[in-house]
Regions:
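Short nucleic-acid-contacting surface segments enriched for D/E, G, S/T with interspersed K/R
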Residues: 81-99
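Short boundary/loop segments of OB/S1/cold-shock single-stranded nucleic-acid-binding domains
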Residues: 22-37
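Bacterial N-terminal signal peptides that target proteins for export
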Residues: 1-9
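Short aromatic-glycine-enriched beta-strand elements
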Residues: 49-60
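Conserved hydrophobic positions within beta-strands
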Residues: 39-43
Length: 132
């Protein structure tokens, strides 16, 4: 009986520990996955950091004003596995890229990167594209 209780207790503890980890790794916790959009602009910066790279771009609005967008993405290790490195992004800084993404639930100029098309026409679509 004692071993059975210990096993149940361990299972309950693991469930409580795993839930926040799963939520952290789910873009749908922060981003509205049902609201995809496409945006073109100048790639200004890429933070090649763990746990997720962050892509910054300036996009001109119809009135000529510039919006400074920030897109979160997969970790650097994911990009290396698909043969795309920091240098590939560095070459595109200052050039026009097209991003397909979803907006943050909190609003603002913040999104999750689903696809990026580089100036040479090559594009990369993230494999992990959850549904709402």
């Amino acid at each position: 009986m004692r071993h059975k209780f210990s096993g149940i207790l361990i299972a309950i503890v693991l469930l409580f520990v795993a839930a926040p980890v799963w939520a952290h790794h789910s873009p749908s916790a922060v981003f509205d996955m049902s609201k995809e959009f496409t945006l073109s602009g100048t790639l200004t910066k890429v933070d090649w950091i763990n746990p997720h790279i962050v892509v910054f771009m300036d996009a001109k609005k119809d009135d000529g004003s510039v919006e400074n967008w920030k897109f979160e993405s997969n970790p650097p290790s994911w990009f290396r596995r698909v043969s795309l490195g920091r240098d590939d992004f560095a070459k595109a800084i200052g050039q026009t890229v097209t991003v397909q993404g979803v907006r943050a639930k909190a609003g603002g100029l913040y999104g999750y990167l689903l696809k990026i098309t580089f100036p040479d026409g090559n594009s990369l679509e993230l494999v992990f594209k959850p549904t709402p």
